[in-house]
Structures are given as C-alpha cells and as structure tokens.
C-alpha cells in the first residue's frame, strides 16, 4: 500500500508505475474523477515519457460536475468546459488564460477546486473574469 496523501500524487504514481514495470499487478485507487484532475493523467504521462509497455486500465465513475449539475437540476448539455482553480500542478497564469477563453466562448463552465486552505484569491479572480 502506497499512501502519500494530498500534494504527493506524482510520487505515489511514480512508485506504483515502478512496481508495474517490475511486473507486479498494481491498482491505483484515489478519490475524485479518475481522468479529470485525478491520477489517470499522471500515470499516462509517465507511460509516454518512459516509452513503457505497461498496460493501463482506467475505471472511471460519474464525474463530480455531472452529479452536481444533476442535483442542482441544471444538466450540462451542448458545449461546456471544466476548469480547476488549483495551481498545484498548473501555473495560475495558464489557468487564468483558460478562464478568459471559456468566458469569451460563452461556455457553461464547471469549476473544480474553487478554494483551499492556502489559496483564497483564485476564486475571486475567477468571479471577476
């Protein structure tokens, strides 16, 4: 069992990937959406960077934004986008460009990670845009 907690996702994925490359059967379990701001993109990126032949299978559940929209009675249809305000793995200036692009294109936007203990201003910046 590899338990790294928050902010150590890359280290956990690297450890799991190394075990898989040694021929072990590995299962990475994490909360959240597997392919949307989850662990799957990290693992696929490692596979690509290493030129690995490790077989990957992702078993996603329903996305949080879909469930939230359903509970609110506001299903998301047609074109839309999903933006995370977390700058742990993506620089804020890149996130801000994406917010501007989504607003310019008039997309319905689902927002992930609107606040955290150490980051309060991004939510307000998003609202201003």
How should these model regions be labeled?
Residues 1-56, 67:
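Class I S-adenosyl-L-methionine
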Residues 7-8, 57, 90, 121:
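Residues that cap or flank secondary-structure elements
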Residues 10, 14, 19, 99-105, ...:
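Non-catalytic terminal and connector segments of soluble metabolic enzymes
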Residues 24-26, 104-129:
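A contiguous loop/helix-start segment that scaffolds small-molecule binding in enzyme catalytic cores
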Residues 33, 87, 114-116:
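Glycine-rich beta-alpha junction loops
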Residues 35-108:
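Class I SAM-dependent methyltransferase SAM-binding "motif I" and its flanking Rossmann-like core
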């Amino acid at each position: 069992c590899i338990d790294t907690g928050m902010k150590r996702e890359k280290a956990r994925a690297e450890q799991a990937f190394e075990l898989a490359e040694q021929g072990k059967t590995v299962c990475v379990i994490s909360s959240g959406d597997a392919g949307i701001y989850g662990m799957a993109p990290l693992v696929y990126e490692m596979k690509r960077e290493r030129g690995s032949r490790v077989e990957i299978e992702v078993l996603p559940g329903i996305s949080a934004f879909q469930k939230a929209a359903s509970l609110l009675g506001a299903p998301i249809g047609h074109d839309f986008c999903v933006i995370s305000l977390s700058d742990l793995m993506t620089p804020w200036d890149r996130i801000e460009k994406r917010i501007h692009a989504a607003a310019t294109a008039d997309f319905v936007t689902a927002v992930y990670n609107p606040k955290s203990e150490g980051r309060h201003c991004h939510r307000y910046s998003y609202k201003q845009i």
